[in-house]
C-alpha cells in the first residue's frame, strides 16, 4: 500500500538452526534426552528473541510457526571411532535408533513448551493433532537389534511402544510449540571449527586440503584419525553414493530438508 503497510503478509523462512556433535552426545548416552532438550530450549530462545521487522513475512512466520532445525554433525567421525564402517548395517542401525531418540525428546520438549505457551499456527490441521504422525512408532519402535549398537546406547532410555503412545497422547492433548523441529544442515565450516566431520556426510578425504583466505593451504585431518581409525575413513567417492543414500534414507525423522552431495 501507499502508506507502506501490507494488505497481505505471507510466511517466509526463518533459519533458526543448530547442530549437536554426535560423538560428544554419545559420550554419555544416558544424557541424550537432556542434550536434545537443552538444544531445543536454546533454539527456542532464538525464536523468541528474533524479530526481523525489515522483512514482515519472515517475522510473521517466526512468530506463528516457531520453526527450528536441530541437526547433527560428526556421524562419520563417531562411527569410525567405534570401528563401524559408514553405510554398513551396523551404521544404518545406529542412525535409525539415534535419530528416533532425538525426535522423541525434541517432540517431548516442544510439547512441554506448548503446554504453557500454546501451539504453532495450524497444529489442529496437522497429523500430530489426530495422532497419525506418530502412529508408526507405536507399532514399530526403533530399538537396537545388534549387540554392537545396543552397547553404544548402554544407559540410555530408548522409547518403546508405550513411551511413544504416551507422547502421542500428550501431544494431542497439549499441542506442539514448534511447527518444525529437526533438520540436517550441511555444517561445512562449522564442523571444522568443532573438530567434527560435516553433518551426517562421509568425509571427502581422510586429510582434507582446503584454501582458507589469507592463510592459504590448510590441512584438516578427520577427527580421531589414527592407525586404527584410518580404514574407516574411506572418502565419499570410495564409500559410494549408495551407502550415502542409504544413510540419509535411515534419517526418516527430520521435519526439514536433508541436503547432500552424491559423489559419483
Mark where each language-model region is.
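Catalytic alpha/beta core of large soluble enzyme barrels
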Residues: 43, 47-49, 119, 153-162, ...
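Alpha-helix initiation and N-capping motif
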Residues: 10, 14, 19, 29, ...
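Structural beta-strand/beta-sheet cores of well-ordered domains, especially the beta-sheet scaffolds
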Residues: 11-18, 66-77, 82, 109, ...
Amino acid at each position: 500500500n501507499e502508506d507502506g503497510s501490507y494488505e497481505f503478509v505471507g510466511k517466509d523462512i526463518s533459519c533458526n538452526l543448530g547442530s549437536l556433535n554426535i560423538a560428544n552426545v554419545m559420550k554419555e548416552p544416558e544424557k541424550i534426552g537432556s542434550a536434545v532438550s537443552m538444544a531445543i530450549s536454546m533454539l527456542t530462545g532464538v525464536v523468541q528473541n528474533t524479530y526481523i521487522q525489515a522483512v514482515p513475512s519472515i517475522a510473521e512466520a517466526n512468530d506463528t510457526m516457531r520453526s527450528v532445525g536441530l541437526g547433527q554433525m560428526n556421524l562419520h567421525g563417531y562411527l569410525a571411532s567405534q570401528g563401524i564402517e559408514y553405510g554398513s548395517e551396523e551404521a544404518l542401525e545406529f542412525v535409525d535408533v539415534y535419530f528416533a531418540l532425538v525426535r522423541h525428546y525434541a517432540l517431548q520438549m516442544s510439547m512441554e513448551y506448548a503446554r504453557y505457551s500454546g501451539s504453532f499456527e495450524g497444529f489442529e490441521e496437522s497429523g500430530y493433532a489426530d495422532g497419525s504422525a506418530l502412529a508408526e512408532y507405536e507399532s514399530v519402535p526403533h530399538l537396537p537389534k545388534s549387540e554392537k549398537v545396543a552397547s553404544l546406547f548402554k544407559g540410555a532410555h530408548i522409547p518403546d511402544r508405550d513411551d511413544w503412545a504416551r507422547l502421542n497422547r500428550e501431544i494431542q492433548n497439549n499441542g506442539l510449540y514448534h511447527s518444525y523441529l529437526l533438520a540436517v544442515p550441511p555444517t561445512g565450516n562449522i564442523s571444522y571449527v568443532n573438530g567434527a566431520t560435516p553433518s551426517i556426510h562421509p568425509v571427502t578425504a581422510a586429510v582434507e586440503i582446503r584454501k582458507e583466505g589469507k592463510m592459504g593451504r590448510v590441512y584438516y585431518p578427520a577427527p580421531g584419525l589414527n592407525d586404527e581409525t584410518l580404514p574407516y575413513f574411506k572418502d565419499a567417492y570410495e564409500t559410494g553414493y549408495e551407502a550415502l543414500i542409504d544413510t540419509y534414507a535411515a534419517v526418516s525423522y527430520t521435519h526439514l530438508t536433508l541436503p547432500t552431495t552424491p559423489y559419483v
